[in-house]
């Protein structure tokens, strides 16, 4: 925000996870980090919540950022002001290497020209498309569909994180509804009637008052998933080509930590003990035969 002058919508609004029974709550992996809400407290926090939810966990330390509408615009402007150049509409066709040392990439420009960009080091961070560029990265797309509905301002203050659906309230009353998990969809584009129906049922399951609010937008994306659903961060088999991919549903959440790790690897900066543990856990070699 300070570099771009654009408000990214970052705020600590808190997340509530509702449960139908207390046993499910006790099994929740981050139970110890949340505040228990009994039925009255849960309904005081979220007026209009579906009555089937009897218990809740409030994670007051968590929040949100408007990554789709604001964050990417802010990031692009901040990068441009610091000398970063973008080639929009270009497609990486091939990695250029010699004696297993990275030299650059060959790309197809938006105007159809085949050009080469030479550099000393590079980071492969191409999301669900990473495997198409570097075949050693075992990443496949898992499609997700989303929509937004328009509600009254301040109608919903907390994020509701249900077992199948989540609702994220923005400051202007818009509520983001996500997201389907379509493992067999590949790179098939577009929203589908079945996907929208699933999201609409999710709204009713969590927050019935919003089921008839007008739809504002529908969209979709492709999550980059590895076989163990954990990211790949570290050095590749090609010297000076680094990997930061496969974050699945946690790309925005892990973006700051990933960038710091990759920066340290590229600049040969010493890692602290926690960073060493992350690198060991997410190293690409775990998938090599």
PLM regions and their residue ranges:
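Helical element adjacent to the flavin cofactor pocket in flavoenzyme catalytic cores
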Residues: 58-121, 125
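Dinucleotide-binding Rossmann-like beta1-alpha1 core, especially the glycine-rich loop
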Residues: 1-46, 54-55, 202
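Short loop/edge segments at beta-strand edges and connector loops
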Residues: 38-39, 72, 88-90, 217-219
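Central helical "cap/lid" subdomain
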Residues: 108-161, 189-193, 209, 273
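A short coil-to-beta-strand element that immediately follows conserved catalytic motifs
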Residues: 10-12, 86-87, 140-144, 208-220, ...
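A short, glycine/Asx- and small/polar-enriched loop/turn
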Residues: 48-54, 96-104, 225-229, 236-239
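C-terminal catalytic lobe of FAD-dependent flavoproteins
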Residues: 68, 213-289
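Active-site lid/adjacent beta-loop-alpha segment flanking the redox-cofactor pocket in flavoenzymes
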Residues: 153-239
């Amino acid at each position: 925000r300070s570099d771009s002058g654009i408000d990214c919508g970052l705020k600590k609004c808190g997340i509530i996870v509702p449960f139908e029974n207390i046993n499910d709550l006790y099994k929740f992996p981050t139970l110890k980090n949340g505040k228990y809400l009994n039925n009255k407290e849960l309904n005081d926090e979220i007026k209009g919540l579906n009555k089937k939810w009897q218990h809740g966990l409030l994670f007051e330390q968590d929040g949100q950022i408007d990554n789709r509408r604001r964050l990417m615009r802010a990031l692009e402007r901040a990068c441009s002001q610091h000398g970063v150049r973008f080639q929009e509409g270009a497609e990486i066709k091939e990695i250029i290497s010699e004696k297993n040392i990275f030299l650059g990439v060959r790309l197809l420009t938006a105007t159809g020209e085949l050009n080469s960009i030479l550099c000393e080091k590079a980071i492969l961070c191409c999301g669900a498309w990473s495997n198409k560029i570097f075949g050693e990265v075992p990443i496949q797309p898992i499609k997700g569909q989303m929509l937004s509905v328009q509600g009254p301002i301040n109608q919903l203050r907390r994020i509701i994180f249900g077992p199948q659906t989540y609702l994220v309230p923005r400051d202007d009353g818009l509520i983001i509804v996500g997201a389907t998990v379509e493992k067999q969809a590949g790179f098939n584009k577009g929203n589908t009637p079945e996907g929208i129906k699933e999201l609409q049922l999710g709204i009713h399951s969590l927050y019935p008052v919003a089921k008839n609010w007008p739809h504002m937008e529908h969209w979709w994306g492709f999550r980059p998933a590895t076989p163990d659903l954990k990211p790949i961060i570290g050095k590749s088999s090609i010297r000076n080509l680094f990997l930061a991919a496969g974050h699945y549903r946690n790309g925005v959440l892990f973006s700051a930590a990933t960038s710091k790790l990759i920066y340290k690897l590229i600049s040969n900066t010493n890692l602290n003990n926690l960073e060493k543990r992350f690198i060991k856990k997410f190293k690409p070699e775990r998938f090599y035969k």
